[in-house]
Amino acid sequence: QEGLNAALLYNDSQSGILQQISNLVPLNEVQTITLLSPYFDECGESLITLSQLCPNSTVNVLIHQDCALPPSGMLPNSSIHFYDFSETKRGKIAFKTYERQLHAKVLHFKTNDAEYCMVGSANATLAGLGTITHRGINEEFGVLYHSTKQDFLSTLGLKTKKRIDVPTNRSKHSNEAPSETGRRLRLLSAYYESGKLNVYSNEEIPDGVLLSID
């Protein structure tokens, strides 16, 4: 598309996604950051880092009210605001067959005359985005789009509407040891799709077994 530029971002041995973004986006000119993610650092480290890197900006975070890993330990920050993803145009799209779960990751920067929008695999966490000096520990990929004409948030249906407090229902993991009747399995992979968690193990999991992932 004319006027639309794109760059591939990924964590490599020399740099991370956030560092690569800093080389492509004029951070001091950013007026607004809009971020969509299903998972966050508990104390909001990545959100705070973005706010510090773009000192003239406001950070708008789109979050699901049932987010399993919200930044529930983050201290109040006048530059960071939270909005209900369910109240956006995209969030209101309903499917008849299953409850919709937020899995998308979008990081959008707006300056006075341009927009930059990254869509990819990285959550709003240090493990995904990394910092300016250190790459994240996860293997992540994303595409950063740049345009002086495109309104990315309108196109994606992600305009902020209803402001909310930070959700506090962060999942808690038990520190208790497994019962004597329990056994440990090595999980090869797991993914969530259409309201169903699919788990693959190194051995067959019998029917009727209660699986606890810690």
Where are these regions (language model features)?
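PLD/PLD-like phosphodiesterase catalytic module centered on the HKD motif
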Residues: Q1-D214
